[in-house]
Amino acid sequence: MEPKYQRILIKLSGEALAGDKGVGIDIPTVQSIAKEIAEVHNSGVQIALVIGGGNLWRGEPAAEAGMDRVQADYTGMLGTVMNALVMADSLQQYGVDTRVQTAIPMQTVAEPYVRGRALRHLEKNRIVVFGAGIGSPYFSTDTTAALRAAEIEAEAILMAKNGVDGVYNADPKKDANAVKFDELTHVEVIKRGLKIMDATASTISMDNDIDLVVFNMNETGNIKRVVLGEQIGTTVSNKASE
């Protein structure tokens, strides 16, 4: 079956790497995620990754507790680099040539982010893991994902969620009558105020015609199903459903 998308960016939360522990990095969990990503990669799909850092650090609560916000955000960026290095190692163990590129130069452990080099890696069937956000405070890893997806001309951002199987009109944990959307447009997401990504990330995705697929990553095989075009989760695009 021909993949629906040829080049994708997968956005993982940092908590996804923590497993049942909720914090830190659980290596078996990382290996399980890496195995699934490697299988999709081996089908010929070009893949980039952005991983959050919430399993290790959260800048906003630290700032609210009195830490300088800029310093707090930079600390969080370093957390995303740790996650990127661990994921890259697991992908390498599954035989996938992988590169880590960081927005803040740290040549001893990773390449500096260079768009042209990232594109060449993808064209050579390497996975690229982007770390350190966009290198500036006040920007989320959602914005990083949208910006990098636009820069590498990805067709879709796969928002892999922990236990969340799509986008609802209300919180399904609080409202038994919450309805899941199969499809939405970027404009509808912004108008409804649905918190899939922050506003900056949503606008970048809309302006660059990048599909956004929100799905439950806890079900094995879901990444592959999304890439093959199966209707799971919620797909957000510029095209209204017919």
From Swiss-Prot:
Region (Involved in allosteric activation by GTP): 19-24
Catalytic activity, as annotated: UMP + ATP = UDP + ADP
UniProt pathway: Pyrimidine metabolism; CTP biosynthesis via de novo pathway; UDP from UMP (UMPK route): step 1/1
Keyword Transferase: yes
InterPro entries, alphabetized: AceGlu_kinase-like_sf, Asp/Glu/Uridylate_kinase, Uridylate_kinase, Uridylate_kinase_bac
Subcellular location: Cytoplasm
E.C. designation(s): 2.7.4.22
Keywords for the protein's UniProt record, in alphabetical order: Allosteric enzyme, ATP-binding, Cytoplasm, Kinase, Nucleotide-binding, Pyrimidine biosynthesis, Transferase
Principal localisation: cytoplasm
CC annotations in GO: cytoplasm
Transmembrane segments: none
Top-level enzyme category: transferase
Sequence positions that bind ATP: K11, L12, S13, G14, G54, R58, N162, Y168, D171
Keyword Repeat on entry: no
Regulation of its function: Allosterically activated by GTP. Inhibited by UTP.
Binding locations of UMP: G53, D73, I134, G135, S136, P137, Y138, F139, S140, T141
A single GO molecular function term of this UniProt record: UMP kinase activity
GO BP: any one term: UDP biosynthetic process
CDD domains hit by this protein: AAK_UMPK-PyrH-Ec (cd04254)
Superkingdom of the source species: Bacteria
Function: Catalyzes the reversible phosphorylation of UMP to UDP.
Self-association state and partner proteins as the record states: Homohexamer.
Similarity field: Belongs to the UMP kinase family.
Protein name: Uridylate kinase
